[in-house]
Amino acid sequence: MSTTKKVKIIVPGSSNADLTGFAPHLPAAGETVMGSSLHIGIGGKGCNQMTAAARAGADAWFVTRVGQDVFGETLRRHFAAEGFRDRYIREDGTAETGCALIEIDERDGQNRILVILGVNRNIGAEDVRAAEADFADADAVLTQLEIDLSAVAEAKRLAQAVGKPFLLNPAPWQPLPDELLCGIDWFTPNETEAGGCSGIGI
């Protein structure tokens, strides 16, 4: 009986616990508003890429960090449930797990989001180099800009060294050096990032 080889995806990226509160209206400065409900979910642009890849049937390898806290445990349970390869997921006790605090106005869906990067800001080139052996038989490498640019640049370098497609979601937008932009195979900005990188209002 023949078996189909899964597409292998490597994602160096961020992972967050998302705390979403719903309220009749968003508080003004100094105001306390009683919320109606709270949802604790999983997010981070890297984790979202991973979850989409795994659910599409890919053999998904994550390069990330989680803190030694309750949100880190929550993320690890999600990783296991989704079938993420966890060889390159590091536990980091120097800071908290990444977290997004999201306020949503129930009237119109408007929101405010505060992201605490936590251990995501520690994800660097050395984390990506630790996964170098798995780049050779990967089908694609995906990343985004919620981690240090050194990690993004190293992921691009390693992917290109073995002839693998490199995909960059340039979010959240920040100015990028020309040497990083040059040679990207797939560049996937949304409206905000497209305006930022082109200098043209969109």
PLM segments and residue spans:
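Glycine-rich phosphate/adenosyl-contacting loop at the front of the ribokinase-like
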Residues: 1-65, 70-81
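Ribokinase/PfkB-type carbohydrate-kinase core domain
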Residues: 2-15, 65, 73, 77-91, ...
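Glycine-rich phosphate-binding loop of ATP-grasp-fold ATP-dependent ligases
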Residues: 98-100
